[in-house]
Amino acid sequence: MPVQGSQRRLLGSLNSTPTATPHLGLAANQTGVRCLEVSVPDGLFLSLGLVSLVENVLVVTAIAKNRNLHSPMYCFICCLALSDLLVSGSNMLETAVTLLLEAGALAARAAVVQQLDNVIDVITCSSMLSSLCFLGAIAVDRYISIFYALRYHSIVTLPRARRAVAAIWVASVLFSTLFIAYYDHAAVLLCLVIFFLAMLVLMAVLYVHMLARACQHAQGIARLHKRQRLAHQGFGLKGAATLTILLGIFFLCWGPFFLHLTLIVLCPQHPTCSCIFKNFNLFLALIICNAIIDPLIYAFRSQELRRTLKEVLLCSW
């Protein structure tokens, strides 16, 4: 994604200058301030992308194969996997093309590289937006299944889920195209940051409310069976730990990238902010790490999906 403070990698690859050796250490920025810069080796970047790609392809394949998984909940999980797949794939493609251009193995005119960069940017941005949207959609789906359990199947129907999925994809592509076209406007970056914060607040409110309801339900059961009070306390701690991990991973993986965008608006020339800008590739790597973790949290915990996945893997041998 083209952002101030980070070089557009494909266009920069047309220069014959060799890239710097990846390192973790202190580097001086233009003002002489010492910065902690974490460079992500291209090999590590490609490896993370490949792991994410394989994981999410397996999720999509398993859900597509098993008709028992053709429900609204798994529809959202499948689309989340597809979004994460595109995030990883687009970043892998950009890195691979960059390496080929730097090595001289791929000859291309600047105009062609510019168009390719724009296409990759749109794919990356739209898949990031859709990934955040589907994380929110999964939270809403789970909330309805708990608080409106008796009416769940009449509220969350497959046709409605498909319409929601279509709306998310169309909106993601449309807005990402606008964001890429007007990326140098502060309002565009602020919109992205506000969108991230809105998704974070939505997920936090819904999951905290769900945890409170679950603890209340467990407490009611414990009152009927006084001996199970310790089990109730353990359930509350386990639920709080799960919620902390879920929201913590989301914030840790996505937060630095959107902090980067926020600082571009607030302090584009400040020495401290310039130090943070140098770690842009690290922030992208964290998003790819989130794409690796998502299947573990939302997909592979399903026994039905794991069983289907085993069948798919056994059939492929």
Curated annotation (Swiss-Prot):
The chain crosses the membrane at residues 38-63, 73-93, 119-140, 164-183, 192-211, 241-266, 280-300. Keywords: Cell membrane, G-protein coupled receptor, Glycoprotein, Lipoprotein, Membrane, Palmitate, Receptor, Transducer, Transmembrane, Transmembrane helix. Its main location: membrane. GO terms for molecular function: melanocyte-stimulating hormone receptor activity. GO terms for cellular component: plasma membrane. Residues 64-72, 141-163, 212-240, 301-317 are cytoplasmic. Glycans are attached at N29. It comes from the Eukaryota. Residues 1-37, 94-118, 184-191, 267-279 are extracellular. InterPro entries: GPCR_Rhodpsn (IPR000276), GPCR_Rhodpsn_7TM (IPR017452), Melcrt_ACTH_rcpt (IPR001671), MSH_rcpt (IPR000761). It is a multi-pass membrane protein. Belongs to the G-protein coupled receptor 1 family. This is Melanocyte-stimulating hormone receptor. It comes from Mandrillus sphinx. The lineage of its organism: Eukaryota, Metazoa, Chordata, Craniata, Vertebrata.
